[in-house]
């Protein structure tokens, strides 16, 4: 549910259905970074919306965040853990009995053409892994689960997102090597994609992690 258009009335209408869980998308862990990406919500919006859901009997809350956003610092990652922890405290304050779970789901930022961040470089695999491990330690909180998007998949997405006609050779090589359904981690083969990059002569960092000049043609 969108936190900036959240409606208590909507929850009341759907509460009669099976309460499998609700997903909210703060996107970033601090107000500063939410302002950078123009998210348009405050921490108060987050806790008000989640609190209303808890009061209406929802016991599984999923929070969606993105890491690797432009200007991100480790304070922003700390903010992700802080929000999750505060929600567990909020549930205790409301006092509804029964098991309560918070799932923090993190995806990796992929810059795309025709967006305000199209000139930005994407985090490298090593950076994503370091941040995942950092969050894994920070989110060792009772009743909080952490999962994240495959960093290898994200880097391939970053290469393709702002690729030019030369990427066609990469796609052909990947297909010939048997790559398919690679959007799902269980089908993704980093080894095959690395081989495809080598065969096609494509430098992945040129497309994914390189900062671009504002006058560069996409």
What residue spans do the PLM features occupy?
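Radical SAM enzyme core and accessory elements
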Residues: 141-218
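Intrinsically disordered or highly flexible coil/loop and linker segments, enriched in small
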Residues: 55, 90-93, 115, 141-145
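Short, compositionally biased low-complexity segments
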Residues: 52-59, 103-109, 197-211
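Conserved SAM/AdoMet-binding glycine-rich loop
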Residues: 1-101
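Long, polar/charge-rich, low-hydrophobicity segments
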Residues: 85, 91-98, 118-129, 134-137
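Short glycine/threonine-rich loop-to-helix capping motif typified by GTGT followed
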Residues: 9-13, 71-80, 113-125, 154-167
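Short connector loops/turns at beta-strand edges and beta->alpha or beta->beta junctions
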Residues: 27-29, 109-112
């Amino acid at each position: 549910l969108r936190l900036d258009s959240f409606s208590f009335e909507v929850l009341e209408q759907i509460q009669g259905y099976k309460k499998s869980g609700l997903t909210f998308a703060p996107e970033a862990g601090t107000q500063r970074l939410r302002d950078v990406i123009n998210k348009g919500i405050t921490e108060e919006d987050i806790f008000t919306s989640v609190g209303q859901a808890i009061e209406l009997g929802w016991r599984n809350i999923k929070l969606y965040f993105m890491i690797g956003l432009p200007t991100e610092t480790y304070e922003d990652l700390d903010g992700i853990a802080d929000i999750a922890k505060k929600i567990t405290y909020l549930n205790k304050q409301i006092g509804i009995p029964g098991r309560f779970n918070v799932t923090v789901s993190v995806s990796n930022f992929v810059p795309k053409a025709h967006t305000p961040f199209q000139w930005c470089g994407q985090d490298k695999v090593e950076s994503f892994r370091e941040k995942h491990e950092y969050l894994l330690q920070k989110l060792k909180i009772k009743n909080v689960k952490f999962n994240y998007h495959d960093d290898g998949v994200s880097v391939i997405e970053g290469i393709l997102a702002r690729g030019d006609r030369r990427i066609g050779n990469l796609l052909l090589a990947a297909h010939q090597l048997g790559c398919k359904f690679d959007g799902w981690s269980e089908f993704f083969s980093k080894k095959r994609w690395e081989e495809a990059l080598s065969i096609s002569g494509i430098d992945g960092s040129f497309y994914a992690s390189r900062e671009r000049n504002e006058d560069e043609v996409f």
